[in-house]
Amino acid sequence: MATIGSGSARVSDTTSTSSAYLMTTNPTATEGNRLLRGASANDASKVPVYHYPPEQDERSKKAPFIEDRLNEELTNPEYVNRLYERWYSEGLSSNEVALGLDQIDNQEVQETYQNLGLGYREYIDWRNSM
């Protein structure tokens, strides 16, 4: 991983899967733009404290932000393959999928959705060449 101010940047190989149609992931910043707001238990003035990564609820081990969940799920090759197969079996074209994924206003998942649409286009090409 790249270190700020180190002068040299190393990037780990994130494309370890052999399938060409899977979505490739690029290393990005580890922190999102969103923070959770909470109150410090030790502070009498109850000044809000912002923290990231957010503390996970004991009942749920999932990340609280949908963007984090989506990025985690959409980098799982098994999940992505099932998603592509479902779209393919429903007869959706890559343009229909791209238009559907393009309707999101959330900037944090927009790049993930664009990569997903490109991966589906490559999946269709791979399936049609079989």
UniProtKB/Swiss-Prot annotation:
> Which residue stretches, if any, does this entry annotate as coiled coil?
none
Keyword Secreted annotated: yes
Write out the GO cellular component annotations.
extracellular region; host cell cytoplasm; host cell nucleus
Q: Please give the residue ranges the record annotates as the region Disordered.
A: 1-61
- Give the domain section of the comments: The RxLR-dEER motif acts to carry the protein into the host cell cytoplasm through binding to cell surface phosphatidylinositol-3-phosphate.
| Pfam families in alphabetical order | RXLR (PF16810)
**Is Secreted included in the keywords of this UniProt record?**
yes
Q: What is its main location?
A: secreted
Q: Which InterPro entries match?
A: RXLR (IPR031825)
Q: What role is this protein assigned?
A: Secreted effector that suppresses pattern-triggered immunity (PTI) in plant host.
Similarity section: Belongs to the RxLR effector family.
Gene this chain is encoded by: RXLR-C16
Quote the biased-composition stretches of kind Polar residues, using this chain's numbering. 1-31
Q: Which organism is it from?
A: Plasmopara halstedii
Q: Which UniProt keywords apply?
A: Host cytoplasm, Host nucleus, Secreted, Virulence
Motif placement: RxLR-dEER: 34-59
The molecule here is called Secreted RxLR effector protein RXLR-C16
> Where is this protein found?
Secreted; Host cytoplasm; Host nucleus
Which Gene3D superfamilies does this entry report, sorted A to Z?
Answer: 1.10.10.2460
Q: What induces it?
A: Expression is up-regulated in spores.
